[in-house]
Amino acid sequence: IFAVAGHNGDVFAYRALVQHLAPDQPFFGLQPAGLEEGSVPLTSVEDMARYFAAQIRAFRPTGPMSIAGYCAGGTVAFELARQLTAAGADVTNLILFGAPYCTSYRPLRVRAAQARYLAGRSVTHARTLLQVPASERRRYLAARLRRLTPRRAAQISDPVLARRQRVEETTMAAVREYTPGPCGCHLDVMLPCSSWRRSWARPLRWGRSTVSTAVFAGPEGCTGDVMLLPGHAPTFAALVTEVQRRLPRPATGAARPSAVRRAAR
């Protein structure tokens, strides 16, 4: 499995998941350009995918292989699987963990989702206000306003954190501009929970561009932010094991390319 991290490029987001996979399941995190000193973030999803594809081909030229992606990294993983498949590589499946459909990140979609969320929260706060003593209502409203007031971003002086911030910003800009084409492989969608099917993220739309799709979901209450953390990692590791059982086992022993980092167990 070759896995694209989220928008910040942190391959160790997969660490807890990998710890619950079988020891004979190869799993490599793909580190994007821009995190290492002297490297520059790539500015399009297509270029990011080409960068990873070149590294994978140097390591495992034809496959079989699985491609995975988490959150916004799912968009890059989709394009990576698409490019590899189009070039003749044996991509047995694409696994997307809590990956919103790429157009869900566009400004109008984001604002619409925020409006729906705030409308729901307004009802909740109105009910709360009715239960708060009159003498405390002004304080409650002031606290809510402080939370909603945007804060000025702090200046980042640490060069490592500054590079990560540039990768985050560049990746999100690229994802918002991406338009997916057809992908000739099977898709396994890992949803944080079943209700995510109907969320702002529209994750099942990825299936419109693949040859087949299977959908799996974690427990209700799980969110994309925590699905790969230790509390839920065993659940999703078991689902990965389930989908990988149908696939041919990959050979091991080749040298690792520079951009491919094995997630620590």
Where in this protein do the model-derived segments appear?
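A hydrolase-biased, glycine/serine/histidine/acidic-enriched motif that marks catalytic-domain neighborhoods
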Residues: 1-265
